[in-house]
Curated annotation (Swiss-Prot):
Keyword annotations from UniProtKB, A to Z: Hydrolase, Serine esterase
Top-tier EC class: hydrolase
UniProt-recorded Gene Ontology molecular function terms: carboxylesterase activity
Protein known as: Esterase FrsA
Pfam families, per the entry: FrsA-like
Record family assignment: Belongs to the FrsA family.
Role summary: Catalyzes the hydrolysis of esters.
Catalytic activity: a carboxylic ester + H2O = an alcohol + a carboxylate + H(+)
EC number(s) reported in the record: 3.1.1.1
Alphabetized InterPro entries for the sequence: AB_hydrolase_fold, FrsA, FrsA-like, FrsA_esterase
Amino acid sequence: MSQANLSETLFKPRFKHPETSTLVRRFSAGKPQAMQSALSGNHVDHWYRLINRLMWIWRGVTPQEILDVQARIVMSEAERTDPELFDTVIGYRGGNWIFEWAKEAMQWQQKAGQEADPLLSGRHWLHASNLYSIAAYPHIKGDELAEQAQALANRAYEEAAQRLPGSLRELEFTIPGGSPITGFLHMPKGDGPFPTVLMCGGLDSLQTDYYNLYENYFSPLGIAMLTIDMPSIGFSSKWTLNQDTSLLHQHALRHLENVPWVDHTRVAAFGFRFGANIAVRLGYLEPQRLKAVACLGPVVHGLLVDPLHQGRVPEMYLDVLASRLGMHDASDEALRVELNRYSLKTQGLLGRRCPTPMLSGFWKDDPFSPEEESRLITSSSADGKLLEIPFNPVYRNFDHALRQIARWINHRFG
């Protein structure tokens, strides 16, 4: 089936689809405050979703494109679940978040199909993949339209990978007691086996969101990157996140000694946000398989155990946590009790000495991940490095931090 036909088949006009903000039915205790975070985006009035401009621009979406799509959503007069929230238009139609971002993606998909230059066509496919991923954001389980957008993001990513430099292989990993999962191994030019970074993304992202990380930071150093979806989304959608947060990534890590393109003696883990929970956990459980662990804005303890901290983060993020845990109808109190078990300190790991070298980067006053979170990680490591990232200029400092982290990992590979 052609990509255009697939889009038409998946996105038939229907108005019965549940609207994203209604899928998690937690008891909300109050009105969220405005919030700004480099890594997770801004919570601004009248939007349910966090507007994550830094990460979207970093992935290749232009600021103008973001504003254009937002404007179409704002201007819509269609019925909304909450009249106060722009991005709650009901049904797949003009003004609906998924509709508008998928419509933008389809334009780039069409450009890709018409472009004769393979490299440029690959860029267009990658752009379409990023836009489909934003359409599906924040990837809440049971969001039918979002799951269709995820499927299109993955298809577009596969098309892009065939045309862009280097090579990409889809690897299937068998997980005992459940469905296998698929990961993408991105490899630079040259002969392998390559030192490899296992990417552990955030709870509100797909594994296809990190191509830029590979292309601009790891590939130039001759490092490959393996991505895996977080439990309950994408290729890992049949799994629910549980207290053994690193289960899927751990099985993938153990399998790498059987992958001929990977130098399994030189593997590191890199975690964004909750992905750092997985990466640090692996640092404790698999020190013989990991040369290093790096984290950015980690969520490993504070947010998971402190109700006041939880009260400072937006509803959307708590909805995402509840969704990953399969707690769509839980009270806030039940969610708090469960989240406490996901703290790596509560689990008896953080605070104990870990032989794996660990770097943790943080932004001052980050509502998701205060400085103490990163200090807890680095002070627990026999070879810890703390990296403070100045907030402004936000894009340049983010880029600089990623370059420092890539060099640090490369140095640990030896």
